[in-house]
From Swiss-Prot:
InterPro entries: IRX15/GXM/AGM. The lineage of its organism: Eukaryota, Viridiplantae, Streptophyta, Embryophyta, Tracheophyta. One of its GO terms (cellular component) is Golgi membrane. This is Glucuronoxylan 4-O-methyltransferase 1. Its main location: Golgi. It holds the Pfam family IRX15_IRX15L_GXM. It is found in: Golgi apparatus membrane. Disruption phenotype: No visible phenotype, due to redundancy with GXM2 and GXM3.
Length: 282
């Protein structure tokens, strides 16, 4: 369904405001850094750098121009985007993993300026199209073996001990674990994970069952401890609703805004004595 024109306008205003705020913060930081520099033998080099150092990063400028002029708005609503952007505002620069590549990808990457934002996408042709427009975005192709019509069976499979055992998804015996991602995806400690893909609105589509499960397992298996903020979009649909509650856990859910749910999942690798006794869900 096409969004209402008024909603599109409000969303565009929010995106431009967020990016403009980010740019203002960047400029203020750059100015403060420059003003605090002392005279040293490297004065000449610092002076030569000042213009380039204070220059607006190309990625931010491109994002601001794109969302100011584009007639296409992201799929999430203004209020939904605000939930994730508030968390990014506190944690960025950070490691941000996004299942899905779309019209909002440049926004997420820009809001995490200075951090690493990675997109996992099922459609190779779409990846190529986006890369032509925004080559600075880091994205990888993902193949999903699951189908929406298998969801009922998979949620039962997920209750078994092979799926509730905490470990690296690459070596998991659980049918829900995604095993074919690039090695660095498993080896990175992700601060935020957004599940807004793959396609899940018809029976033969891959659905988000494995993406949701794997996001939760990556958060629990995070080696350096800490917590991971996990977001799931389209929870108005049955699969996103059931699988997020089952594998990200209602006890870890912090907020729901519209079709977006926000979970905060602790690492189960914190080195404490209770680590091995911690239940899959609280």
């Amino acid at each position: 369904m096409r969004p209402k024109a008024n909603q599109n306008h409000k969303l565009k205003v929010l995106l431009v405001f967020l990016l403009a705020t980010l740019i203002l913060i960047f400029i203020v930081r750059s100015t403060l850094t420059s003003s605090q520099e002392h005279q040293t033998p490297q004065e000449t080099r610092s002076t030569r750098c000042s213009g380039a150092c204070n220059k607006l990063p190309r990625s931010l400028a491109q994002a601001l121009i794109h969302y100011s002029t584009s007639v296409i708005t992201p799929q999430q609503t203004l209020k939904e985007i605000a939930v994730s952007s508030r968390v990014l505002g506190k944690k960025s620069p950070c490691n941000f993993l996004v299942f899905g590549l779309g019209h909002d990808s440049l926004m997420w990457s820009s809001l995490n300026y200075g951090g690493r934002t990675v997109f996992l996408e099922e459609d190779e042709a779409w990846i190529k199209q986006i890369k032509r427009r925004f080559p600075m975005l880091e994205s990888y192709h993902v193949t999903y073996d699951s189908k929406v019509n298998q969801a009922d069976n998979l949620i039962e499979v997920g209750k078994g001990p092979e799926c509730t055992a905490i470990g690296d998804p690459r070596y998991s015996m659980c049918q829900l674990a995604l095993k074919g991602l690039p090695a660095e995806i498993y080896e990175t400690g992700w601060d935020l994970i957004m599940v807004d893909a793959p396609t899940g609105y018809y029976d033969e589509a891959p659905g988000r069952m494995t993406a949701i499960y794997t996001a939760g397992m990556m958060a629990r298996n995070r080696k350096q401890g800490g917590e991971t903020d996990v977001f799931v979009h389209d929870v108005n649909r049955e699969i996103e609703d059931k699988f997020s509650k089952a594998f990200l856990c209602e006890g870890y859910m912090k907020k729901q805004e519209g079709r977006l749910r926000h979970f905060i999942i602790p690492s189960y690798r914190d080195g404490s004595e209770s680590e091995s006794n911690r239940p899959f869900c609280p």
